[in-house]
Amino acid sequence: GDFLKLLGNGKEFGLKHINYTYQEGEGGIAEALRLAEFFASGEKICVVLGDNIIEKNIRKAVEHFRRQKKGAKILLKEVPDPQRFGVAELKGDRIARIEEKPGKPKSRYAVVGIYFFDQEVFNVIKTLKPSGRGELEITDVNNRYIEKRLMTWDILEGWWTDAGTFKSLIRANQLVAKTGANNL
């Protein structure tokens, strides 16, 4: 219910529409994305993780991806604690690899849980093997696009936090109270 109230049909964020699905149990983000194949209708899609809270909207990134002929796009944000996130290793203007929660991060750029994919993402997911956690990992999907040099990226403007820990949930509440969220 709250997702529907907050996000509506997606038009306010520059999207054509938003569809919702429900994942029973834990299977990984890529498994959850696989559930969306039936309503993606061969079109490009945007995936936003439910614990992301951002200051600015993603309209600019949506427009950049809309003009991209094929492949994927992720949003990055420089963070003080990159070991908590998937981290992008940058080589010039491209991403060389994404490493999930590295002990020694190769950059301070966390992968924000906002992803854009072309219709090939579902074929990529079908080739994945479950990780050691028994899940289909979105990092593996992103690394496949990187290997094919079909991944682009933008820096997310404004602040970003996840609400995945009690500490980050408190921080999210403070940030939203101070500046609001999803501002134009």
Name what the model sees in each region.
Residues 84-86, 90-96:
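Conserved catalytic core of nucleotide-sugar-dependent glycosyltransferases
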Residues 52-54, 78-81, 102, 158-159:
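Glycine-rich beta-alpha junction loops
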Residues 47-48, 72-75, 153:
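Structural beta-sheet core signal
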Residues 56-84:
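Conserved donor-nucleotide/metal-binding helix-loop-beta segment in metal-dependent transferases, i.e.
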Residues 62, 66, 94-184:
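Catalytic-core segments of class I nucleotidyltransferases/pyrophosphorylases
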Residues 1-49, 53, 58-60, 67, ...:
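Conserved N-terminal catalytic core of the sugar/cofactor nucleotidyltransferase
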Residues 9-15, 89-90, 144-146:
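Short, conserved catalytic or adaptor-binding loops enriched in Gly and charged residues
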Residues 25-29, 81-82, 104-105, 160-162:
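A short acidic, often aromatic-flanked loop/helix-cap motif at beta-alpha or helix-coil junctions
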